[in-house]
A protein has these predicted regions:
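Conserved Class I S-adenosyl-L-methionine
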Residues: 44-108
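Exposed alpha-helical structural elements
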Residues: 15-18, 34, 38, 67, ...
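Active-site capping/gating segments
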Residues: 25-57
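Conserved class I S-adenosyl-L-methionine
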Residues: 1-34
Length: 108
């Protein structure tokens, strides 16, 4: 079985390869930490065996800042209030980069 987790640090927004903003991932991390703890408990109990771990970047592409602000607004993540107008005004494609961990688990 595969377990995909979002991991720290906070996701960041890139414009033409340069970081222009960070997204507060803490609300999502709190939820993800609870899910991770549940899986870790099953590993500790011997019900699951962790066979492989891969930490990697995931990139999500947006057509412009308004598209990104709308998507973040509908998620557990948040932009700091002071950066929303500047990000929403960007009329070029943006990329959000975040760290994820993929684990291969086996039922014992």
């Amino acid at each position: 079985m595969l377990d995909l987790q979002v991991i720290r640090p906070d996701p960041f927004v890139e414009l033409d390869g340069e970081v222009v903003a960070r997204i507060d991932g803490e609300p999502l991390f709190a939820w993800a930490d609870a899910a991770t703890a549940a899986v870790e408990a099953r590993i500790a109990a011997g019900d699951l065996v962790e066979e492989a771990v891969d930490d990697h970047d995931v990139r999500k592409h947006y057509s412009d800042g308004a598209d990104l602000v709308e998507d973040v607004g509908a998620s557990k993540r948040r932009f700091p209030e002071e950066v929303i107008p500047a990000v929403a005004a960007i009329m070029k494609p943006l990329v959000v980069r975040e760290r994820c961990r993929l684990r291969r688990l086996r039922v014992r």
